[in-house]
């Protein structure tokens, strides 16, 4: 009688559902998964080591490139670490701007996740819908920083500049003309805050569209209900944070439990799941988009009523205005020193974490008193989630691995660093 053996299969890194560069070695018994072994490191760029060779203020751009769909949330943890070690006070207006852009980033991330997750499972429409909304939010990034993705907008002491009074408009082209052009520019007549406010009015309707397509869809439920179940106790043991932990029923959110910036002044809820399966995590992230929309609305209202400075006036840490640099010798010296050698941070260490769209994103920073970090450690939420893949996938079918990778919301920039 011939021997029955499990066979080994490579999943990725070329697979379209591998979300970048995931290589999984799957051990299969027929079509049932016995073991799944993630092989990481294909996107390793040595970010932590590179940061040790750059002045503190020159590594912000590296943070954007960690989780490259949640750019400003990464920057936030890094600049908060520097501010904590230097004891810098951030103006209240800058704090509201940061919180507003953190939530815009959360929606951007969840739209990308929803579109890609649905596409992996076979629902193509949601992918196209999600990218329609992402376009508007990318325009907000571009309005404040000039870049659609890698913004480098957060700076130690505040943000790069205040919110613009005008929004860029679409111009006539072979793609946009006449009535369509007027429709596209309708919400771009006022300031950036007017544009964001108009978006927050439209967005709940868009989320309803996604839910109409997926939430009660029989095929979607068959592919996600009771797949990749993680109990609350096990989720804590595995180091889950963010929607992965809340999907298992634990209401842990740093914005509520360890408030930073102005989150303690804002009204929002923490959505939690009940069973800890892929479907629950889907519901949690969709509910989070609605909550983020609520927070953005509150920030817009406050920012419209309260003008003020958006960055600290300590020119040892923040650059002087261009007008000052052109007319004042001392300001020019500050500017030159800041952009050539940066500033020295007192000896010590700090750990700062933010409620990133994927979970707890933390920066552990050690300074030896020089102008560069002695050591920088990034605590990436996706790393802990990916480590649980073997446990979550065991006993499921090979097609369910795609649903489980999707529900974990893995981005390899932060996992491989």
UniProtKB/Swiss-Prot annotation:
It comes from Hydrogenovibrio crunogenus (strain DSM 25203 / XCL-2) (Thiomicrospira crunogena). The keyword Transport applies. This is NADH-quinone oxidoreductase subunit D. Pfam families: Complex1_49kDa. NDH-1 is composed of 14 different subunits. Subunits NuoB, C, D, E, F, and G constitute the peripheral sector of the complex. NDH-1 shuttles electrons from NADH, via FMN and iron-sulfur (Fe-S) centers, to quinones in the respiratory chain. The immediate electron acceptor for the enzyme in this species is believed to be ubiquinone. Couples the redox reaction to proton translocation (for every two electrons transferred, four hydrogen ions are translocated across the cytoplasmic membrane), and thus conserves the redox energy in a proton gradient. HAMAP family: NDH1_NuoD (MF_01358). Keywords: Cell inner membrane, Cell membrane, Membrane, NAD, Quinone, Translocase, Transport, Ubiquinone. Belongs to the complex I 49 kDa subunit family. InterPro entries: NADH_Q_OxRdtase_suD (IPR001135), NADH_UbQ_OxRdtase_49kDa_CS (IPR014029), NDH1_su_D/H (IPR022885), NiFe-Hase_large (IPR029014). It is found in: Cell inner membrane. One of its GO terms (molecular function) is NADH:ubiquinone reductase (non-electrogenic) activity. It is a peripheral membrane protein. Its EC number is 7.1.1.-. GO terms for cellular component: plasma membrane.
